[in-house]
Protein backbone atom coordinates (compact mmCIF):
# COMPACT_ATOMS: atom_id res chain seq x y z
CA UNK A 1 0.00 0.00 0.00
CA UNK A 2 1.12 3.57 -0.67
CA UNK A 3 0.53 4.42 2.96
CA UNK A 4 3.11 1.86 4.11
CA UNK A 5 5.74 4.52 3.49
CA UNK A 6 4.46 6.43 6.54
CA UNK A 7 3.70 3.46 8.82
CA UNK A 8 6.00 0.47 8.12
CA UNK A 9 9.39 -0.27 9.70
CA UNK A 10 11.33 0.86 12.79
CA UNK A 11 12.27 4.18 11.17
CA UNK A 12 8.58 5.10 10.95
CA UNK A 13 8.02 4.87 14.71
CA UNK A 14 7.74 8.71 14.97
CA UNK A 15 5.14 8.70 12.19
CA UNK A 16 3.16 5.94 13.90
CA UNK A 17 3.39 7.75 17.21
CA UNK A 18 1.75 10.82 15.71
CA UNK A 19 -0.92 8.69 14.05
CA UNK A 20 -1.63 6.97 17.36
CA UNK A 21 -2.11 10.41 18.90
CA UNK A 22 -5.11 10.75 16.57
CA UNK A 23 -6.50 7.38 17.71
CA UNK A 24 -5.12 5.03 15.05
CA UNK A 25 -4.55 1.54 16.48
CA UNK A 26 -1.86 -1.00 15.56
CA UNK A 27 -4.45 -3.12 13.76
CA UNK A 28 -5.60 -0.10 11.75
CA UNK A 29 -2.02 0.52 10.63
CA UNK A 30 -2.39 -2.59 8.47
CA UNK A 31 -5.46 -1.23 6.66
CA UNK A 32 -5.77 1.16 3.69
CA UNK A 33 -5.66 4.85 4.65
CA UNK A 34 -8.41 6.70 2.78
CA UNK A 35 -8.62 10.47 2.42
CA UNK A 36 -12.12 11.89 2.75
CA UNK A 37 -11.79 15.21 0.93
CA UNK A 38 -14.68 17.38 2.06
CA UNK A 39 -15.55 20.88 0.87
CA UNK A 40 -18.02 21.43 3.73
CA UNK A 41 -18.63 24.94 5.02
CA UNK A 42 -21.67 26.68 6.44
CA UNK A 43 -21.93 29.73 4.17
CA UNK A 44 -22.88 27.83 0.99
CA UNK A 45 -26.23 26.00 0.75
CA UNK A 46 -24.61 23.49 -1.58
CA UNK A 47 -22.04 22.63 1.08
CA UNK A 48 -23.84 23.00 4.40
CA UNK A 49 -24.81 19.31 4.50
CA UNK A 50 -21.56 17.77 3.29
CA UNK A 51 -20.43 16.99 6.85
CA UNK A 52 -23.30 14.48 7.01
CA UNK A 53 -22.28 12.94 3.70
CA UNK A 54 -18.71 12.68 4.98
CA UNK A 55 -19.91 10.73 8.02
CA UNK A 56 -21.72 8.29 5.72
CA UNK A 57 -18.62 7.95 3.55
CA UNK A 58 -16.45 7.26 6.60
CA UNK A 59 -18.91 4.65 7.85
CA UNK A 60 -18.70 2.92 4.48
CA UNK A 61 -14.90 2.98 4.54
CA UNK A 62 -14.85 1.40 8.00
CA UNK A 63 -17.42 -1.21 6.93
CA UNK A 64 -15.12 -2.27 4.09
CA UNK A 65 -11.97 -2.41 6.20
CA UNK A 66 -10.37 0.96 5.56
CA UNK A 67 -9.36 3.83 7.83
CA UNK A 68 -10.84 7.23 6.91
CA UNK A 69 -9.11 10.58 7.45
CA UNK A 70 -11.09 13.72 6.67
CA UNK A 71 -9.71 17.06 5.55
CA UNK A 72 -11.30 20.09 3.93
CA UNK A 73 -10.89 22.29 0.88
CA UNK A 74 -12.06 25.84 0.27
CA UNK A 75 -15.30 26.54 -1.56
CA UNK A 76 -16.69 29.74 -3.08
CA UNK A 77 -20.42 30.26 -3.61
CA UNK A 78 -20.80 31.89 -7.01
CA UNK A 79 -24.25 33.14 -6.06
CA UNK A 80 -22.99 35.01 -3.01
CA UNK A 81 -19.85 36.17 -4.83
CA UNK A 82 -21.93 37.36 -7.79
CA UNK A 83 -21.92 40.94 -9.01
CA UNK A 84 -18.95 42.29 -7.04
CA UNK A 85 -15.20 41.88 -6.52
CA UNK A 86 -15.70 38.48 -4.91
CA UNK A 87 -16.52 36.87 -8.25
CA UNK A 88 -12.92 37.45 -9.35
CA UNK A 89 -11.94 34.72 -6.89
CA UNK A 90 -14.34 32.01 -8.05
CA UNK A 91 -12.64 30.54 -11.12
CA UNK A 92 -9.14 30.96 -9.62
CA UNK A 93 -10.30 28.90 -6.63
CA UNK A 94 -10.50 25.86 -8.93
CA UNK A 95 -6.72 25.54 -9.05
CA UNK A 96 -6.34 26.36 -5.35
CA UNK A 97 -8.69 23.46 -4.54
CA UNK A 98 -6.79 21.11 -6.81
CA UNK A 99 -3.45 22.17 -5.35
CA UNK A 100 -4.56 21.80 -1.72
CA UNK A 101 -5.80 18.27 -2.39
CA UNK A 102 -2.47 17.41 -4.00
CA UNK A 103 -0.58 18.83 -1.02
CA UNK A 104 -2.56 16.84 1.55
CA UNK A 105 -2.65 13.57 -0.38
CA UNK A 106 1.02 13.61 -1.36
CA UNK A 107 2.22 14.71 2.07
CA UNK A 108 0.31 11.95 3.87
CA UNK A 109 0.55 9.22 1.22
CA UNK A 110 -3.09 8.14 1.24
CA UNK A 111 -3.99 4.92 -0.55
CA UNK A 112 -7.18 6.31 -2.03
CA UNK A 113 -9.62 9.18 -1.69
CA UNK A 114 -13.30 9.93 -1.66
CA UNK A 115 -13.98 13.43 -2.96
CA UNK A 116 -17.06 15.27 -1.66
CA UNK A 117 -17.52 18.48 -3.66
CA UNK A 118 -20.52 20.58 -4.52
CA UNK A 119 -21.06 23.80 -6.47
CA UNK A 120 -19.50 25.40 -9.48
CA UNK A 121 -15.70 25.43 -9.22
CA UNK A 122 -15.39 22.92 -6.41
CA UNK A 123 -16.50 19.91 -8.45
CA UNK A 124 -14.00 20.55 -11.28
CA UNK A 125 -11.27 21.32 -8.75
CA UNK A 126 -11.77 17.92 -7.11
CA UNK A 127 -11.96 16.15 -10.47
CA UNK A 128 -8.75 17.80 -11.63
CA UNK A 129 -7.01 16.60 -8.48
CA UNK A 130 -8.21 13.06 -9.20
CA UNK A 131 -6.69 13.24 -12.67
CA UNK A 132 -3.43 14.76 -11.49
CA UNK A 133 -2.83 12.40 -8.56
CA UNK A 134 -4.17 9.22 -10.21
CA UNK A 135 -4.68 7.24 -7.03
CA UNK A 136 -7.93 5.28 -6.56
CA UNK A 137 -10.70 7.84 -6.20
CA UNK A 138 -14.46 8.11 -6.21
CA UNK A 139 -16.57 11.28 -6.20
CA UNK A 140 -19.72 11.94 -4.19
CA UNK A 141 -21.23 15.18 -5.47
CA UNK A 142 -23.34 16.98 -2.89
CA UNK A 143 -26.65 16.92 -4.73
CA UNK A 144 -29.17 19.49 -5.95
CA UNK A 145 -31.37 21.76 -3.87
CA UNK A 146 -35.11 21.24 -4.01
CA UNK A 147 -36.88 24.01 -5.91
CA UNK A 148 -38.82 26.61 -3.98
CA UNK A 149 -42.51 27.14 -4.61
CA UNK A 150 -43.82 30.70 -4.91
CA UNK A 151 -47.03 32.06 -6.43
CA UNK A 152 -48.05 28.58 -7.59
CA UNK A 153 -44.80 28.00 -9.49
CA UNK A 154 -41.54 26.21 -8.79
CA UNK A 155 -38.72 28.72 -8.31
CA UNK A 156 -34.95 28.81 -7.97
CA UNK A 157 -32.11 31.30 -7.53
CA UNK A 158 -32.49 32.56 -11.10
CA UNK A 159 -36.08 33.50 -10.28
CA UNK A 160 -34.66 35.86 -7.66
CA UNK A 161 -31.89 37.15 -9.94
CA UNK A 162 -34.37 37.98 -12.69
CA UNK A 163 -36.63 39.45 -10.04
CA UNK A 164 -34.06 42.22 -9.57
CA UNK A 165 -34.64 43.40 -13.14
CA UNK A 166 -38.40 42.90 -12.90
CA UNK A 167 -38.59 44.90 -9.67
CA UNK A 168 -36.43 47.73 -11.06
CA UNK A 169 -38.73 47.90 -14.10
CA UNK A 170 -41.85 48.03 -11.93
CA UNK A 171 -43.09 44.66 -13.18
CA UNK A 172 -43.47 43.14 -9.71
CA UNK A 173 -44.30 44.68 -6.34
CA UNK A 174 -41.99 44.88 -3.35
CA UNK A 175 -44.10 42.19 -1.66
CA UNK A 176 -43.75 39.85 -4.64
CA UNK A 177 -40.02 40.57 -4.81
CA UNK A 178 -39.60 39.75 -1.11
CA UNK A 179 -41.50 36.50 -1.53
CA UNK A 180 -39.09 35.45 -4.26
CA UNK A 181 -36.14 36.29 -2.02
CA UNK A 182 -37.57 34.41 0.96
CA UNK A 183 -38.91 31.25 -0.68
CA UNK A 184 -37.02 30.46 -3.90
CA UNK A 185 -33.99 28.73 -2.35
CA UNK A 186 -35.39 25.83 -0.35
CA UNK A 187 -32.40 24.64 1.69
CA UNK A 188 -29.33 22.45 1.32
CA UNK A 189 -27.99 21.61 -2.12
CA UNK A 190 -26.65 23.13 -5.31
CA UNK A 191 -29.06 25.48 -7.10
CA UNK A 192 -32.06 23.61 -8.46
CA UNK A 193 -31.65 23.88 -12.25
CA UNK A 194 -29.16 22.61 -14.81
CA UNK A 195 -26.72 25.29 -13.78
CA UNK A 196 -22.95 24.79 -13.50
CA UNK A 197 -22.82 22.74 -10.29
CA UNK A 198 -25.42 20.23 -11.40
CA UNK A 199 -23.98 20.14 -14.92
CA UNK A 200 -20.57 19.24 -13.51
CA UNK A 201 -22.14 16.60 -11.28
CA UNK A 202 -23.70 15.12 -14.42
CA UNK A 203 -20.31 15.26 -16.13
CA UNK A 204 -18.76 13.41 -13.19
CA UNK A 205 -21.27 10.59 -13.49
CA UNK A 206 -20.99 10.48 -17.29
CA UNK A 207 -17.19 10.25 -17.03
CA UNK A 208 -17.61 7.25 -14.76
CA UNK A 209 -16.15 8.81 -11.60
CA UNK A 210 -19.25 8.62 -9.39
CA UNK A 211 -21.74 5.85 -8.76
CA UNK A 212 -24.85 5.64 -10.96
CA UNK A 213 -27.56 8.03 -9.81
CA UNK A 214 -25.23 10.23 -7.78
CA UNK A 215 -25.46 13.39 -9.91
CA UNK A 216 -29.18 14.01 -9.49
CA UNK A 217 -29.79 12.43 -6.07
CA UNK A 218 -30.86 15.46 -4.06
CA UNK A 219 -29.01 16.81 -1.06
CA UNK A 220 -31.88 15.96 1.29
CA UNK A 221 -32.74 12.59 -0.29
CA UNK A 222 -31.93 9.36 1.53
CA UNK A 223 -30.51 8.13 -1.78
CA UNK A 224 -27.62 10.53 -1.35
CA UNK A 225 -26.70 9.14 2.06
CA UNK A 226 -26.84 5.59 0.69
CA UNK A 227 -24.67 6.53 -2.30
CA UNK A 228 -22.18 8.18 0.06
CA UNK A 229 -21.94 5.05 2.22
CA UNK A 230 -21.66 2.79 -0.84
CA UNK A 231 -18.92 5.06 -2.22
CA UNK A 232 -17.01 4.67 1.05
CA UNK A 233 -17.25 0.92 0.74
CA UNK A 234 -16.30 0.96 -2.92
CA UNK A 235 -13.14 3.03 -2.47
CA UNK A 236 -11.56 0.27 -0.37
CA UNK A 237 -12.21 -2.17 -3.21
CA UNK A 238 -10.76 0.31 -5.71
CA UNK A 239 -7.56 0.44 -3.66
CA UNK A 240 -7.34 -3.37 -3.65
CA UNK A 241 -7.97 -3.43 -7.41
CA UNK A 242 -5.61 -0.49 -8.01
CA UNK A 243 -8.28 0.97 -10.29
CA UNK A 244 -7.28 4.60 -10.69
CA UNK A 245 -8.98 7.53 -12.49
CA UNK A 246 -6.69 7.37 -15.52
CA UNK A 247 -7.68 3.73 -16.02
CA UNK A 248 -11.33 4.82 -16.09
CA UNK A 249 -11.31 8.16 -17.91
CA UNK A 250 -10.18 8.17 -21.54
CA UNK A 251 -10.68 10.36 -24.58
CA UNK A 252 -13.85 8.40 -25.28
CA UNK A 253 -15.08 9.15 -21.75
CA UNK A 254 -14.80 12.86 -22.47
CA UNK A 255 -16.74 12.41 -25.69
CA UNK A 256 -19.47 10.64 -23.72
CA UNK A 257 -19.56 13.45 -21.18
CA UNK A 258 -19.82 16.15 -23.85
CA UNK A 259 -22.67 14.30 -25.54
CA UNK A 260 -24.53 14.14 -22.22
CA UNK A 261 -23.76 17.84 -21.74
CA UNK A 262 -25.31 18.64 -25.11
CA UNK A 263 -28.36 16.46 -24.49
CA UNK A 264 -29.19 18.06 -21.12
CA UNK A 265 -28.50 21.67 -22.19
CA UNK A 266 -25.68 22.05 -19.68
CA UNK A 267 -23.76 25.10 -18.59
CA UNK A 268 -21.28 26.79 -20.94
CA UNK A 269 -18.77 26.54 -18.09
CA UNK A 270 -18.15 22.95 -19.15
CA UNK A 271 -16.13 24.42 -22.03
CA UNK A 272 -13.74 25.72 -19.36
CA UNK A 273 -13.77 22.80 -16.95
CA UNK A 274 -13.69 19.75 -19.19
CA UNK A 275 -10.63 20.93 -21.20
CA UNK A 276 -8.85 21.78 -17.93
CA UNK A 277 -9.78 18.36 -16.58
CA UNK A 278 -8.60 16.62 -19.74
CA UNK A 279 -5.30 18.47 -19.37
CA UNK A 280 -4.82 16.94 -15.92
CA UNK A 281 -5.58 13.50 -17.34
CA UNK A 282 -2.86 14.01 -19.96
CA UNK A 283 -5.41 14.36 -22.76
CA UNK A 284 -6.33 17.10 -25.21
CA UNK A 285 -9.83 18.52 -25.54
CA UNK A 286 -10.03 21.49 -27.91
CA UNK A 287 -12.95 23.90 -27.82
CA UNK A 288 -13.93 22.74 -31.30
CA UNK A 289 -14.77 19.28 -29.92
CA UNK A 290 -17.80 20.75 -28.17
CA UNK A 291 -19.17 22.16 -31.40
CA UNK A 292 -18.45 19.01 -33.37
CA UNK A 293 -20.33 16.86 -30.86
CA UNK A 294 -23.10 19.42 -30.47
CA UNK A 295 -23.87 19.17 -34.18
CA UNK A 296 -24.22 15.39 -33.78
CA UNK A 297 -26.07 15.28 -30.45
CA UNK A 298 -29.65 16.50 -30.06
CA UNK A 299 -30.99 18.38 -27.07
CA UNK A 300 -33.26 15.90 -25.27
CA UNK A 301 -34.51 17.46 -22.04
CA UNK A 302 -35.65 21.01 -21.33
CA UNK A 303 -34.28 22.02 -17.94
CA UNK A 304 -33.95 25.33 -16.15
CA UNK A 305 -32.77 27.92 -17.13
CA UNK A 306 -33.68 27.15 -20.74
CA UNK A 307 -36.85 25.21 -19.99
CA UNK A 308 -39.51 24.48 -17.38
CA UNK A 309 -38.12 21.38 -15.63
CA UNK A 310 -35.95 21.32 -12.52
CA UNK A 311 -33.36 18.73 -11.51
CA UNK A 312 -36.05 17.28 -9.24
CA UNK A 313 -38.03 16.26 -12.33
CA UNK A 314 -34.88 15.03 -14.09
CA UNK A 315 -33.97 12.83 -11.14
CA UNK A 316 -37.45 11.33 -10.94
CA UNK A 317 -37.33 10.65 -14.69
CA UNK A 318 -34.16 8.59 -14.30
CA UNK A 319 -31.35 11.14 -14.20
CA UNK A 320 -28.11 10.94 -16.14
CA UNK A 321 -28.43 7.26 -16.96
CA UNK A 322 -31.87 7.82 -18.49
CA UNK A 323 -30.37 10.35 -20.90
CA UNK A 324 -27.43 8.04 -21.61
CA UNK A 325 -29.94 5.30 -22.37
CA UNK A 326 -31.50 7.55 -25.03
CA UNK A 327 -28.02 8.33 -26.38
CA UNK A 328 -26.82 4.71 -26.27
CA UNK A 329 -26.40 4.39 -30.04
CA UNK A 330 -23.98 7.35 -29.99
CA UNK A 331 -22.05 6.65 -26.79
CA UNK A 332 -18.91 4.60 -26.19
CA UNK A 333 -20.60 1.94 -24.06
CA UNK A 334 -17.37 0.04 -23.40
CA UNK A 335 -16.00 2.77 -21.14
CA UNK A 336 -15.33 1.70 -17.57
CA UNK A 337 -16.91 3.34 -14.54
CA UNK A 338 -15.94 3.57 -10.91
CA UNK A 339 -18.22 0.68 -9.88
CA UNK A 340 -16.11 -1.64 -12.04
CA UNK A 341 -18.75 -2.02 -14.73
CA UNK A 342 -18.91 -0.46 -18.16
CA UNK A 343 -21.45 2.19 -19.08
CA UNK A 344 -23.24 -0.39 -21.19
CA UNK A 345 -23.44 -2.84 -18.29
CA UNK A 346 -24.79 -0.13 -15.99
CA UNK A 347 -27.42 0.86 -18.55
CA UNK A 348 -28.49 -2.79 -18.87
CA UNK A 349 -29.29 -2.70 -15.15
CA UNK A 350 -31.11 0.65 -15.23
CA UNK A 351 -34.65 0.58 -13.86
CA UNK A 352 -36.92 3.47 -14.80
CA UNK A 353 -39.26 3.77 -11.82
CA UNK A 354 -41.35 6.59 -13.27
CA UNK A 355 -41.83 5.60 -16.93
CA UNK A 356 -44.57 8.13 -17.61
CA UNK A 357 -42.46 11.08 -16.44
CA UNK A 358 -39.43 9.66 -18.22
CA UNK A 359 -41.34 9.60 -21.51
CA UNK A 360 -42.83 13.06 -20.94
CA UNK A 361 -39.66 15.04 -20.27
CA UNK A 362 -36.80 13.10 -21.89
CA UNK A 363 -37.36 13.11 -25.62
CA UNK A 364 -35.96 10.67 -28.18
CA UNK A 365 -33.25 10.96 -30.80
CA UNK A 366 -35.98 10.83 -33.42
CA UNK A 367 -38.07 13.61 -31.86
CA UNK A 368 -35.73 15.87 -29.85
CA UNK A 369 -36.35 19.32 -28.42
CA UNK A 370 -33.62 20.68 -30.70
CA UNK A 371 -31.75 18.84 -33.43
CA UNK A 372 -28.43 20.12 -32.09
CA UNK A 373 -26.98 20.12 -28.61
CA UNK A 374 -27.17 22.84 -26.00
CA UNK A 375 -23.88 24.65 -26.73
CA UNK A 376 -22.51 26.24 -29.91
CA UNK A 377 -19.00 27.56 -30.52
CA UNK A 378 -18.90 30.79 -32.55
CA UNK A 379 -15.88 32.24 -34.34
CA UNK A 380 -15.25 35.24 -36.54
CA UNK A 381 -13.62 38.65 -36.60
CA UNK A 382 -14.79 39.40 -33.05
CA UNK A 383 -13.72 36.00 -31.68
CA UNK A 384 -10.92 34.53 -33.83
CA UNK A 385 -10.14 31.87 -31.21
CA UNK A 386 -13.75 31.16 -30.35
CA UNK A 387 -16.66 32.02 -28.07
CA UNK A 388 -19.54 30.01 -26.63
CA UNK A 389 -23.30 30.35 -26.34
CA UNK A 390 -25.97 28.14 -24.78
CA UNK A 391 -28.00 27.96 -27.97
CA UNK A 392 -30.69 25.81 -26.36
CA UNK A 393 -31.64 28.77 -24.15
CA UNK A 394 -31.75 31.39 -26.95
CA UNK A 395 -35.03 32.56 -28.49
CA UNK A 396 -35.01 31.35 -32.14
CA UNK A 397 -35.55 34.88 -33.47
CA UNK A 398 -32.20 35.87 -31.89
CA UNK A 399 -30.21 33.08 -33.55
CA UNK A 400 -29.40 35.40 -36.46
CA UNK A 401 -29.09 38.99 -35.36
CA UNK A 402 -27.15 42.18 -36.05
CA UNK A 403 -27.22 45.20 -33.78
CA UNK A 404 -25.23 48.19 -32.50
CA UNK A 405 -22.75 47.75 -29.67
CA UNK A 406 -23.09 49.36 -26.25
CA UNK A 407 -19.64 48.95 -24.73
CA UNK A 408 -18.70 48.68 -21.04
CA UNK A 409 -15.31 47.96 -19.51
CA UNK A 410 -16.69 46.11 -16.48
CA UNK A 411 -19.85 44.38 -15.34
CA UNK A 412 -20.72 47.04 -12.77
CA UNK A 413 -20.94 49.77 -15.41
CA UNK A 414 -23.15 47.58 -17.59
CA UNK A 415 -25.39 46.70 -14.66
CA UNK A 416 -25.96 50.35 -13.76
CA UNK A 417 -26.83 51.13 -17.37
CA UNK A 418 -29.26 48.23 -17.66
CA UNK A 419 -31.08 49.08 -14.43
CA UNK A 420 -31.22 52.75 -15.45
CA UNK A 421 -33.04 51.77 -18.64
CA UNK A 422 -30.23 52.87 -20.96
CA UNK A 423 -30.12 49.55 -22.82
CA UNK A 424 -32.84 49.40 -25.46
CA UNK A 425 -34.29 46.64 -27.65
CA UNK A 426 -31.94 46.01 -30.56
CA UNK A 427 -28.73 46.76 -28.63
CA UNK A 428 -25.83 44.36 -28.19
CA UNK A 429 -24.23 44.86 -24.79
CA UNK A 430 -20.45 44.32 -24.84
CA UNK A 431 -18.72 43.76 -21.48
CA UNK A 432 -14.95 43.45 -21.72
CA UNK A 433 -11.81 43.27 -19.56
CA UNK A 434 -13.55 40.47 -17.68
CA UNK A 435 -11.50 37.58 -19.10
CA UNK A 436 -9.17 35.27 -17.16
CA UNK A 437 -6.33 37.83 -17.23
CA UNK A 438 -8.32 41.02 -17.62
CA UNK A 439 -10.60 40.61 -14.62
CA UNK A 440 -8.57 38.92 -13.47
CA UNK A 441 -10.62 35.85 -12.68
CA UNK A 442 -13.18 35.77 -15.52
CA UNK A 443 -16.26 36.79 -13.60
CA UNK A 444 -19.74 35.52 -14.39
CA UNK A 445 -22.12 38.08 -15.83
CA UNK A 446 -25.27 36.69 -14.19
CA UNK A 447 -26.23 39.98 -12.56
CA UNK A 448 -26.28 41.69 -15.96
CA UNK A 449 -27.99 38.88 -17.86
CA UNK A 450 -30.60 38.36 -15.15
CA UNK A 451 -31.31 42.10 -15.09
CA UNK A 452 -31.90 41.96 -18.84
CA UNK A 453 -34.14 38.95 -18.38
CA UNK A 454 -36.12 40.53 -15.58
CA UNK A 455 -36.74 43.60 -17.73
CA UNK A 456 -37.97 41.42 -20.59
CA UNK A 457 -35.04 42.21 -22.89
CA UNK A 458 -33.53 38.79 -23.59
CA UNK A 459 -35.66 38.40 -26.70
CA UNK A 460 -34.39 41.69 -28.13
CA UNK A 461 -30.95 42.37 -26.61
CA UNK A 462 -27.78 40.27 -26.86
CA UNK A 463 -24.75 40.33 -24.57
CA UNK A 464 -21.18 39.59 -25.67
CA UNK A 465 -18.27 39.30 -23.23
CA UNK A 466 -14.79 37.92 -22.68
CA UNK A 467 -16.07 36.96 -19.24
CA UNK A 468 -18.27 33.97 -18.63
CA UNK A 469 -21.81 33.20 -17.55
CA UNK A 470 -23.59 31.44 -14.76
CA UNK A 471 -25.10 28.13 -15.68
CA UNK A 472 -28.33 29.92 -14.87
CA UNK A 473 -27.95 32.38 -17.74
CA UNK A 474 -30.43 32.22 -20.61
CA UNK A 475 -30.85 34.25 -23.78
CA UNK A 476 -28.46 35.40 -26.54
CA UNK A 477 -25.46 35.69 -24.22
CA UNK A 478 -22.12 34.93 -25.84
CA UNK A 479 -19.13 34.50 -23.56
CA UNK A 480 -15.51 33.35 -23.40
CA UNK A 481 -14.68 35.62 -26.36
CA UNK A 482 -11.06 34.83 -27.23
CA UNK A 483 -8.58 36.42 -27.43
CA UNK A 484 -9.76 38.48 -24.47
CA UNK A 485 -9.57 42.28 -24.33
CA UNK A 486 -6.61 42.27 -21.97
CA UNK A 487 -4.61 40.36 -24.59
CA UNK A 488 -5.56 42.88 -27.28
CA UNK A 489 -8.30 40.75 -28.79
CA UNK A 490 -10.77 42.39 -31.19
CA UNK A 491 -13.29 42.81 -28.37
CA UNK A 492 -10.94 45.47 -26.94
CA UNK A 493 -11.33 47.48 -30.14
CA UNK A 494 -15.13 47.65 -30.30
CA UNK A 495 -16.68 51.13 -30.06
CA UNK A 496 -20.20 52.23 -29.20
CA UNK A 497 -22.41 51.95 -32.27
CA UNK A 498 -20.29 49.38 -34.12
CA UNK A 499 -22.46 46.72 -35.69
CA UNK A 500 -21.99 43.18 -34.40
CA UNK A 501 -23.28 40.17 -36.33
CA UNK A 502 -24.43 37.05 -34.49
CA UNK A 503 -25.23 33.96 -36.57
CA UNK A 504 -25.59 30.86 -34.43
CA UNK A 505 -26.52 28.44 -37.26
CA UNK A 506 -23.40 29.55 -39.16
CA UNK A 507 -21.36 29.67 -35.92
CA UNK A 508 -20.32 33.26 -36.63
CA UNK A 509 -19.56 36.27 -34.42
CA UNK A 510 -18.31 39.23 -36.43
CA UNK A 511 -17.45 42.88 -35.87
CA UNK A 512 -18.80 44.66 -38.94
CA UNK A 513 -15.99 47.12 -39.59
CA UNK A 514 -13.34 47.07 -42.30
CA UNK A 515 -10.03 45.28 -41.84
CA UNK A 516 -8.29 48.61 -42.34
CA UNK A 517 -10.28 50.22 -39.53
CA UNK A 518 -9.56 47.24 -37.28
CA UNK A 519 -5.82 47.54 -37.99
CA UNK A 520 -5.84 51.26 -37.18
CA UNK A 521 -7.60 50.67 -33.88
CA UNK A 522 -5.19 47.84 -33.06
CA UNK A 523 -2.18 50.06 -33.72
CA UNK A 524 -3.36 52.63 -31.18
CA UNK A 525 -4.52 50.11 -28.56
CA UNK A 526 -3.04 50.46 -25.08
CA UNK A 527 -4.30 47.96 -22.50
CA UNK A 528 -5.48 49.52 -19.24
CA UNK A 529 -3.18 49.18 -16.27
CA UNK A 530 -4.34 47.03 -13.39
CA UNK A 531 -3.14 47.15 -9.81
CA UNK A 532 -3.63 43.61 -8.58
CA UNK A 533 -1.99 42.05 -5.54
CA UNK A 534 -2.05 38.72 -3.74
CA UNK A 535 -3.21 35.51 -5.34
CA UNK A 536 -4.98 37.25 -8.23
CA UNK A 537 -1.68 38.82 -9.31
CA UNK A 538 -0.06 35.38 -9.50
CA UNK A 539 -3.13 34.00 -11.25
CA UNK A 540 -3.10 36.81 -13.81
CA UNK A 541 0.51 36.01 -14.73
CA UNK A 542 -0.06 32.26 -15.06
CA UNK A 543 -3.55 31.78 -16.50
CA UNK A 544 -4.15 30.85 -20.13
CA UNK A 545 -6.95 31.89 -22.46
CA UNK A 546 -10.55 30.78 -22.00
CA UNK A 547 -10.43 28.77 -25.23
CA UNK A 548 -7.88 26.46 -23.55
CA UNK A 549 -10.00 25.99 -20.43
CA UNK A 550 -8.33 28.81 -18.51
CA UNK A 551 -5.67 26.39 -17.32
CA UNK A 552 -2.87 27.54 -15.04
CA UNK A 553 0.65 26.25 -15.58
UniProtKB/Swiss-Prot annotation:
InterPro entries: Dihydro-acid_dehy_C (IPR042096), DihydroxyA_deHydtase (IPR004404), DiOHA_6PGluconate_deHydtase_CS (IPR020558), ILV_EDD_C (IPR056740), ILV_EDD_N (IPR000581), IlvD/EDD_N (IPR037237). Keywords: 2Fe-2S, Amino-acid biosynthesis, Branched-chain amino acid biosynthesis, Iron, Iron-sulfur, Lyase, Magnesium, Metal-binding. It comes from Methanosarcina acetivorans (strain ATCC 35395 / DSM 2834 / JCM 12185 / C2A). One of its GO terms (biological process) is isoleucine biosynthetic process. This is Dihydroxy-acid dehydratase 2. The active site is at 470 (proton acceptor). The lineage of its organism: Archaea, Methanobacteriati, Methanobacteriota, Stenosarchaea group, Methanomicrobia. PROSITE patterns: ILVD_EDD_1 (PS00886), ILVD_EDD_2 (PS00887). Homodimer. Functions in the biosynthesis of branched-chain amino acids. Catalyzes the dehydration of (2R,3R)-2,3-dihydroxy-3-methylpentanoate (2,3-dihydroxy-3-methylvalerate) into 2-oxo-3-methylpentanoate (2-oxo-3-methylvalerate) and of (2R)-2,3-dihydroxy-3-methylbutanoate (2,3-dihydroxyisovalerate) into 2-oxo-3-methylbutanoate (2-oxoisovalerate), the penultimate precursor to L-isoleucine and L-valine, respectively.
